[in-house]
Amino acid sequence: MKISLGCDHGGYALKEHIKAYLESKGHEVVDCGTYSTDSCDYPIFGEAAARKVQSGECERGIVICTTGIGISIAANKVRGIRCALCSEPLSAEMTRRHNNANMLAMGAGMIGKNMAERIVEVFLSAEFEGGRHERRVGLLDAIEG
């Protein structure tokens, strides 16, 4: 699977860890930055990663900042993006199964590397259930106008 990654300075170390983890599992990664721990603005990198998913260049995206909140908000401003902030595997599974989320946000200050790996693995392997959830996702998409 081709996956976009984005982070700010607070998520840099975890992004680099997840990047290596994904590549070790055979995934192709598009790293949208940031590329250091120098202070930067999370909306830039949340949007950049989301645009890769929006365009179809990437199938899914993962964004990381200290809490995951700001960067998830940034990603969700991009039309067609459903980015869910997850801190444990069950939320990652359910957001794929019920919300057809195409992006995952995590907070580097909230979870460790092992938990992040578990969340990512579940997020990438869970499938959308469709059915009644298809209608609900359609209603979400309609809000975008």
Named regions from a protein language model:
Residues 2-3, 58-61, 80-82:
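Short active-site oxyanion
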Residues 4-6, 10-11, 89-145:
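C-terminal binding/interaction regions
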Residues 5-24:
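Glycine-rich phosphate/diphosphate-binding loop of Rossmann-like nucleotide-binding domains
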Residues 28-39:
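A short beta-strand-loop structural module common to alpha/beta enzyme folds
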Residues 43-47, 87-88:
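Charged helix-capping and loop-helix junction motifs
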Residues 45-63:
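Short, structured active-site "lid" loops
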Residues 63-64, 69-109:
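Mid-chain, well-packed structural core segment of small domains
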